[in-house]
From Swiss-Prot:
Protein's membrane topology: Multi-pass membrane protein
Protein's UniProt name: Mitochondrial distribution and morphology protein 34
A single GO molecular function term of this UniProt record: lipid binding
Occurrences of domain SMP-LTD (ranges): 1-197
Length: 367
């Protein structure tokens, strides 16, 4: 069984993200003492030569998950270029026996400068030779997991600003190879895993089609005129000057006459607005115990003078009706028929005969 792998031309977005991820990975953790600046990746190219893969084992093969063990061999033309700052003096290790400046001057503790000097350095890595056993797990939900079972780095070519100084060149070669081995062990698998998760997340967003909302639109509320009950007018007036429809102030006396007549009847003020027997189904009955305010449409320059009524039963008609019609909703803009508002109150107290009073107090005793 054989497979053909295509090594594509990677996009600019891939290179930009890979450069940012590599910069973060190279600056993570403890760097060598001679490197005093941050490491910035300046160039990255994956090359045109693909790696070689030999299938050793297929452990899981399905539409959602794949797991396999491969022998990975790479000897391509990929390269990586980065820059940083190094300390020119001392460029030495912790031990005097393995110092990079081995000679009589360093053995006596003599240095080339009296104070440390930071020098910019540019490094290019190329001619990678890798060989390893790779465990590859591909999941459509969790991404790609890549693990090297052994050290993959065989050799790498390090070119730097200090290639003319052989001692520094050998020191950089050893340090960079050590950092690359650590990167292949820990950093590269995490970078590939994050790249695969971002790719899967982008692919899932493209497949999701937004569905329109099925909730019905709420009907708009009718506008409330602001001039019906002015908020700045808080003076309460007796009901003797309140009309349920727009009328001239001269009509107040006729309304008061109706109030006085209705207060003496047995039905109370039930038929004040509309005669008995003609109430429609939409008529409303309000029970309230306070006073109301006059709408702005009934206000005039000179407020009318309240007219006091006297009833034989001791009922204060004006005060009692003022307690009946509290609430702005009595004549609010939402009242469907303001002229058909029915009012109910208790009839005036009438003295009852002694016979009726005695009949109500009659007690029955069972022997």
């Amino acid at each position: 069984m054989s497979f053909n792998f295509t090594w594509p031309e990677f996009s600019a977005e891939f290179y930009e993200y890979a450069v940012q991820t590599l910069t973060t990975a190279l600056n993570r953790g403890q760097k060598p003492k001679s490197i005093v600046g941050d490491i910035h990746v300046k160039g990255l190219h994956m090359g045109r030569v693909p790696p070689e893969l030999e299938i050793l084992e297929i452990g899981d093969l399905s539409r959602e998950r794949f797991r396999g063990i491969f022998r990975f061999v790479y000897a391509g033309d990929a390269h990586l270029e980065f820059s940083t700052g190094v300390q020119a003096n001392p460029l030495a290790r912790g031990s005097e026996d393995h110092g990079i400046f081995s000679g009589p001057m360093t053995s006596r503790g003599m240095l080339f400068a009296a104070s440390p000097l930071t020098v910019p350095m540019r490094v290019c890595l190329s001619d990678f030779k890798l060989r390893a056993i790779v465990v590859l797990v591909v999941s459509r939900t969790k991404g790609i997991t890549l693990v090297f079972k052994n050290d993959p780095l065989e050799s790498v070519k390090v070119s730097s600003t200090f290639d003319s100084v052989g001692v520094i060149q050998r020191y950089l070669q050893e340090e960079i190879e050590g950092q690359l081995r650590e990167m292949f062990r820990a950093d590269l698998p995490s970078i590939i895993h994050r790249l695969s998760q971002d790719w899967l997340r982008t692919e899932s967003k493209e497949k999701v089609v937004p569905t329109p909302s099925a909730q019905p639109a709420k009907p708009a509320m009718p506008p409330v005129p602001s001039d019906v009950w002015p908020s700045h007018h808080t003076a309460d007036v007796p009901l003797s000057v309140l009309a349920l429809e727009e009328a001239a102030p001269s009509a107040y006396a006729s309304h008061l006459t109706k109030l006085d007549t209705a207060s003496q009847s047995s039905q109370g003020l039930k038929d004040l607005v509309q005669p008995a027997g003609s109430h429609p189904a939409g008529a409303r009955t309000f029970h309230t115990t306070s006073r109301v305010r006059v709408p702005s449409s009934l206000e005039s320059n000179a407020p009318p003078t309240p007219i006091a009524l006297s009833s034989p039963g001791g009922l204060d008609v004006a005060g009692h009706l003022a307690e009946l019609l509290r609430a702005n909703h009595t004549l609010s803009p939402y009242t469907p028929h303001p002229r058909l508002v029915a009012l109910r109150t208790m009839p005036a107290h009438r003295p009852r005969s002694s016979r009726v009073h005695a009949r109500q107090k009659r007690a029955f005793h069972l022997s």
